[in-house]
Amino acid sequence: MTSCHIAEEPIQKVAIFGGTHGNELTGVFLVKHWLENGAEIQRTGLEVKPFITNPRAVKKCTRYIDCDLNRIFDLENLGKKMSEDLPYEVRRAQEINHLFGPKDSEDSYDIIFDLHNTTSNMGCTLILEDSRNNFLIQMFHYIKTSLAPLPCYVYLIEHPSLKYATTRSIAKYPVGIEVGPQPQGVLRADILDQMRKMIKHALDFIHHFNEGKEFPPCAIEVYKIIEKVDYPRDENGEIAAVIHPNLQDQDWKPLHPGDPMFLTLDGKTIPLGGDCTVYPVFVNEAAYYEKKEAFAKTTKLTLNAKSIRCSLH
């Protein structure tokens, strides 16, 4: 009996990035550990390379030195002539692209897992860049099922103007892993354990796939970005209101028109306008104050994946 499935090439090269942001310590801590003792991330027939992406920022325990490394992996920055005048992160991006890419080439790594923390109450989050990627939808379904009953959310950043050029985007299959809440420059054991399990399940999925296991059609719930929301500001551009207590820590929960969104110092509530229910994420994220983002609005939808199987079997 034959089944109708998509034959995918086997996965051979995997990288795990930590320290893309130097003050998000779970990935830094895990990658440093795996560089010393990588037994738990090794799988038969698979090359798995742990890697510290922004060592200078890690050393200073800061998000970045000159600019955000996780926003500059576009072909323009990757193609700039190397010189000492370039921002440190642009030079580093070119080095990373040389080691793990080149981006959009046959030689690039198959999968890059990029490990991040958020100060927002987002729990375990997988970040997806392409809603039509059967392989990653299948992987995310496997991770979500394996983590249950612990919730694991999928954040889809596929958007013509809001998608950004991530560090992991040089891989054929880019995977963002975001776990919180955790303050910048801090390690929490519970967050560490959750991220470690996410990587374990992801590598197990790849191993099963390479061994010839067929994954039947599946569906996952995802939250797709639709808009970034700035804080209310005064005429000088200063923040004029804070996240309302009713919204604080309510990532992934429905926010209805009329629900409190911001609170001013004189006690005035600013509600959500419009006529659509949204699902906020990255609520009050510390790193996004400089980006003028109080939270991101998402809409909830379902993605379907076809059956997949490794082409070697």
Curated annotation (Swiss-Prot):
Active-site residue numbers: 178
Residues involved in Zn(2+) binding: 21, 24, 116
Cofactor requirements of the protein: Zn(2+)
Site (Transition state stabilizer): 63
Gene3D superfamilies: 2.20.25.160, Zn peptidases
Reactions it catalyzes: an N-acyl-L-aspartate + H2O = a carboxylate + L-aspartate; N-acetyl-L-aspartate + H2O = L-aspartate + acetate
UniProt cofactor note: Binds 1 zinc ion per subunit.
InterPro entries (UniProt xref): AspA/AstE_fam, Aspartoacylase, AstE_AspA_cat, Aste_AspA_hybrid_dom
Annotated signal peptide: none
Compartments in which it is found: Cytoplasm; Nucleus
Binding site for N-acetyl-L-aspartate: 63, 70-71, 164, 168, 288
Keyword Zinc: yes
Oligomeric form and interacting partners: Homodimer.
Protein name (Swiss-Prot/TrEMBL): Aspartoacylase
Species of the source: Pongo abelii (Sumatran orangutan)
